[in-house]
Amino acid sequence: MELIKEETAPEDDSRGRQRDCRTSVVSSKQVQRNQLEICPGLVSGDVHPMCRDRSDPEPRTGDAASDDGFPADKTSSKRDSECAAVNTDGVSDGRQGKKKHRRRPSKKKRRWKPYFKLTWEEKKELDERETARASRVRAEMFAKGLPVAPYNTTQFLMEEHDREEPDLNTELGGRKSGAIRSEDTASEDENFEAEEDDEEEGGGGSDGMGRPGQAGGEFLQKDFSETYEKYHVEALQNMSKQELVREYLELEKCMSRLEEENNWLRHVRRNPESPADGTGSQRVRELEVEVEKLRAENNELLLKTPASNEPGLNQSQPS
């Protein structure tokens, strides 16, 4: 009130006092303006109606009606929306700081398939890689002086089963199989004899699962036969049509040859005294040799005898 009275009726002696009051009022207005510029939306995220930029002019006394609940002017609503947009941008930049790293799938995709879906060639390549890796690891362990166990594989089972299977290529298979098997016959015979002696001494033994040895052998043989059958079916599925036809023709030839051999053996068993057996054929050969010798002697005698009117040995007498 004193300020208003002094402004209405100023005196000459109080000019300095009036100037000081005006400067204090201006400084209080600047402080209020700075407080309004710090928008509470930066802290709480809500849009405050009193937020405005520094470039906006100071609100007049007539504009205070909008703060009392009455609708504000268009300029004030526009300023509020701009302030809210600025505040939200500031909050997002302040909270995130830098661009968020989005994880993307790697370009180097690992093409992995389960083992039962692999083809025969892929399985073979996988086994070869695993064998090479195992041998490399074993070599490293051996170089470090650590104990090394042999590489665990079941390939020897397939090799033994292939030996027992008949060779379908009868013409070439006999020579190759004879050359290959001749190396291992002695060692295999010795192993079989040793196993038979052990079984006789131990009374049959067991397979380690509480069953007798014979039952365990039958179970293992059945299991192995099923596994080998699955392998054979898979091999046939991977063959082309021409390969299947060729395989079928070879099997037909082999079956016809085996049927002929079977019929011949049955005939020999039914008629043991027939010339089809080994002793009869040997006797026939001996007789043929004797006939050849007699013919040679006859020819020599014909050459030695002089040409005369007397008939020779083989000359027919005139009738």
UniProtKB/Swiss-Prot annotation:
Residues 203-216 have a biased composition (Gly residues). The keyword Repressor applies. Residues 185-202 have a biased composition (Acidic residues). Residues 1-111, 157-223, 262-286, 299-319 are annotated as: Disordered. GO terms for cellular component: cytoplasm; nucleoplasm. Gene3D superfamilies: 6.10.250.2910. It is found in: Nucleus; Cytoplasm. Keywords: Coiled coil, Cytoplasm, Nucleus, Repressor, Transcription, Transcription regulation. Belongs to the HEXIM family. Transcriptional regulator which functions as a general RNA polymerase II transcription inhibitor. Core component of the 7SK RNP complex: in cooperation with 7SK snRNA sequesters P-TEFb in a large inactive 7SK snRNP complex preventing RNA polymerase II phosphorylation and subsequent transcriptional elongation. Plays a role in the regulation of DNA virus-mediated innate immune response by assembling into the HDP-RNP complex, a complex that serves as a platform for IRF3 phosphorylation and subsequent innate immune response activation through the cGAS-STING pathway. This is Protein HEXIM1.
